[in-house]
Curated annotation (Swiss-Prot):
CDD domains per the UniProt record, alphabetical: RuBisCO_large_I
Swiss-Prot/TrEMBL site (Transition state stabilizer) positions: K334
Main localization (coarse): plastid
Subunit comment: Heterohexadecamer of 8 large chains and 8 small chains; disulfide-linked. The disulfide link is formed within the large subunit homodimers.
Native organism: Brachypodium distachyon (Purple false brome)
A single GO cellular-component term on record: chloroplast
Organism placement in taxonomy: Eukaryota, Viridiplantae, Streptophyta, Embryophyta, Tracheophyta
Note: The basic functional RuBisCO is composed of a large chain homodimer in a 'head-to-tail' conformation. In form I RuBisCO this homodimer is arranged in a barrel-like tetramer with the small subunits forming a tetrameric 'cap' on each end of the 'barrel'.
Annotated cofactor note: Binds 1 Mg(2+) ion per subunit.
GO molecular function: magnesium ion binding; monooxygenase activity; ribulose-bisphosphate carboxylase activity
Protein name as it appears in the record: Ribulose bisphosphate carboxylase large chain
Stated family: Belongs to the RuBisCO large chain family. Type I subfamily.
């Protein structure tokens, strides 16, 4: 940082460039149960000591600015300031540190993810004294989490609404994602639902384009839901994407979905924004709608290891803002997702209490104090050969979503859905019999092919499809 340059006014006021360490680096501080705790990966500029960098992060994300100001004397900075209370080097890195910052609860508006992020991941990420900055994790105290509604319904309520127990749920994103007419789109939904899937889904960028306006899509998809329910005797759903250019338009679409009597709507929570998402989540709880969340834009924020924000933080924020499902990677598919890291934030989405576990990237113990859980959705480049691994990795409380892995079946959409349903039922039965899905998965799928020609055809098509790239974001 710049050297201390001070001038003394006649009343004793000192102005100049601050040395942040003097005020915001407090290694003796004992954190409170009510503090929001943050773990930042800090990469200082050459010549900036880690204590100064960590203190600068604490200052610029709470009460501080670059100089001393007159109005500092009009409040209690000790009560409101963030504190960098611990620093540790990142293993294998010469110029990176994990800096732990504690924020007093009074800095944040109740029930507002928007306000929380505006402070913690605001202007500080452009601070010149840092080459890079990444928020790795947050500890949300029960005192603060209790000010949020959280998911509209949660895992158990969703199962009760759908009357589906003891297995993962199956979904399919309709493809091509853009260009279909509303009627053809609804036809594809019907075929997939009739074939055995629980859900079909709007792609994240399907909103209301010239080739398919939202109201037409909603009507044809509702027809597909009711027709497939009548034929199969199962409750079905389609994630109707309510994301829009304004909150008012988003709510108009959600209201129309409720009037159609469908069970679930959808929102792109990062591009749509946390304020819009929380508004929609409150409406969904009040009106009995499930809420599916897509994380479009997340990789812009979370994929680089040195800068941005880890997805586990975005996952916690979503649980607070509200959503019943969220896309969470696949481990085995085409999208980024290292196994232990993915399992770490899957637990943060579903469980009531999660212990600190650095081996899975969890920096803090998190107690959600009975806030409803969120179902993780595995989607992206998966097919029937992945079913044993997905069932073993994600367990029953998950949605396994096959887009191309359903619609790419050589015999059509309904046979593609049937192949996925047979593969899932075979894996669940084998698991319940005590078989090892990780070791015997391929054998289980081959055995099921003998009595399901649809599955046999799918296995032949996708037998050589793999996405074998090393993940970018890994445990240190």
């Amino acid at each position: 940082m710049s050297p201390q340059t001070e001038t003394k006014a006649s009343v004793g006021f000192k102005a100049g460039v601050k040395d942040y360490r003097l005020t915001y680096y407090t290694p003796e501080y004992e954190t409170k149960d009510t503090d929001i705790l943050a773990a930042f990966r800090v990469s200082p500029q050459p010549g900036v000591p880690p204590e100064e960098a960590g203190a600068a992060v604490a200052a610029e994300s709470s009460t501080g600015t670059w100089t001393t100001v007159w109005t500092d004397g009009l409040t209690s900075l000790d009560r409101y300031k963030g504190r960098c209370y611990h620093i540790e080097p990142v293993p294998g890195e010469d110029s990176q540190w994990i800096c732990y910052v504690a924020y007093p609860l009074d800095l944040f508006e109740e029930g507002s993810v928007t306000n929380m992020f505006t402070s913690i991941v605001g202007n500080v990420f452009g601070f010149k004294a840092l080459r890079a900055l990444r928020l790795e994790d947050l500890r949300i105290p029960p005192t603060y989490s209790k000010t949020f509604q959280g998911p509209p319904h949660g895992i158990q309520v969703e199962r009760d609404k759908l009357n589906k127990y003891g297995r993962p749920l199956l979904g399919c994103t309709i493809k091509p994602k853009l260009g279909l007419s509303a009627k053809n789109y609804g036809r594809a939904c019907y075929e997939c639902l009739r074939g055995g899937l629980d859900f079909t889904k709007d792609d994240e960028n399907v909103n209301s384009q010239p080739f398919m306006r939202w109201r037409d899509r909603f009507v044809f998809c509702a027809e597909a839901i009711y027709k497939s329910q009548a034929e199969t005797g199962e409750i079905k759903g389609h994630y109707l994407n309510a994301t829009a250019g304004t909150c008012e338009e988003m709510m108009k679409r959600a209201v129309f979905a409720r009037e159609l009597g469908v069970p679930i709507v959808m929102h792109d929570y990062l591009t749509g924004g946390f304020t819009a998402n929380t508004t929609l989540a409150h409406y969904c709880r009040d009106n009995g709608l499930l809420l599916h969340i897509h994380r479009a834009m997340h990789a812009v924020i979370d994929r680089q290891k040195n800068h941005g924000m880890h997805f586990r933080v975005l996952a916690k924020a979503l649980r607070m803002s509200g959503g019943d499902h969220i896309h969470a990677g696949t481990v085995v598919g085409k999208l980024e997702g290292e196994r232990e890291i993915t399992l770490g934030f899957v637990d943060l989405l579903r469980d009531d209490f999660i212990e600190k576990d650095r081996a899975r990237g969890i920096f803090f113990t998190q107690d959600w104090v009975s806030m409803p859980g969120v179902i993780p959705v595995a989607s992206g480049g998966i097919h029937v050969w992945h079913m044993p691994a997905l069932t073993e990795i994600f367990g029953d409380d998950s949605v396994l979503q096959f887009g191309g892995g359903t619609l790419g079946h050589p015999w059509g959409n309904a046979p593609g859905a049937a192949a996925n349903r047979v593969a899932l039922e075979a894996c669940v039965q084998a698991r319940n019999e005590g078989r090892d899905l990780a070791r015997e998965g391929n054998e289980i799928i081959r055995a099921a092919c003998k009595w399901s020609p649809e599955l046999a055809a799918a296995c032949e098509v996708w037998k050589a499809i793999k996405f074998e790239f090393a993940p970018v974001d890994t445990i240190d």
